[in-house]
């Protein structure tokens, strides 16, 4: 069967739902597809709750993690939407998922207000650089008291302001995902209002299309008879089929190959552009030669490194960080783009220890090379838990 060609007529934006478990992230995602399907049936297939809920599964640390990718269109834009799992255990995936967002819909149940995972997701969104947030105050049909709704809204705004989002100015839309899903016209209207807020408050991202191509690899699989496919979100540049690429990072040696095909949502593309989630077919590359954490680049435009200087913020105990200080030769994992690599920390002269809540500079030596450049962001993690966030300030080797 010939693959349908992807029409690139509208601007493309990556968004996702974040928030506490059971506040209605998946229901809202399903409701968005239903309401948009009812408005523009020719543009949007409806994705029922069950279909999103049984998202493709990924295993991490023995926990089964699912992340659903849904696509839909408003009149203005084409969206790729990730429904992030809500569990605190799934934060690893949130880091990979949230890293793919130009903006997020923070779902908060009006019946509960902000909960621990709400805070955690907002903190994480800030760390991984989700630039814009729109709030869906869900289950608003279940709260009759206007004052209570206003109070919850205020709480959410304060939480966002505390994490350096413009809490006073960003849109908070009262919705009922369930009622909209059941076809209630009033609540369907509220959902359209939410999507208008997303259209207007999450700016068209400045794409990095002018820069040389780079895509971090998230997943690798084999397609029988066609070869090895790597998937991920193109970070910058443009790649066309039959162009040469280089695979850099994790391994000692970089590999050169040719990209023989590009696809998105099972449709063939004539190019991969910065900001898009794509699959790249690589010629003559074995599955075992590629792994998550490598990057696909325009040959010669990025180099693997193991030693760097960085400026970091270590989370306080209240933010879910360490309870105790760390010392010279601390060995956590450094999470770059899509993967964790262990590294050894050297503290600056005169610094004996770093307390939770501190800002510091450090020198890090990784046990595996990572394609890096100055200003690249990373998370510092221990056993899957984020304990700090940083940026590369200088590459040593």
Curated annotation (Swiss-Prot):
Protein name as catalogued:
Elongation factor Tu
Catalyzed reaction equations: GTP + H2O = GDP + phosphate + H(+)
UniProt lineage? Bacteria, Bacillati, Actinomycetota, Actinomycetes, Micromonosporales
Which function does this protein serve?
GTP hydrolase that promotes the GTP-dependent binding of aminoacyl-tRNA to the A-site of ribosomes during protein biosynthesis.
* HAMAP family listed in its UniProt record: EF_Tu_B
Annotated region described as G2, given as residue ranges: 62-66
Region (G4), start-end ranges: 138-141
Q: Where does GTP bind?
A: 19-26, 83-87, 138-141
Chain's gene name: tuf
Q: Name one GO molecular function term.
A: GTP binding
Q: Which residues lie within the region annotated G1?
A: 19-26
Q: Where is the tr-type G domain?
A: 10-206
The Enzyme Commission number assigned here is: 3.6.5.3
PROSITE patterns under this entry? Answer: G_TR_1 (PS00301), G_TR_2 (PS51722)
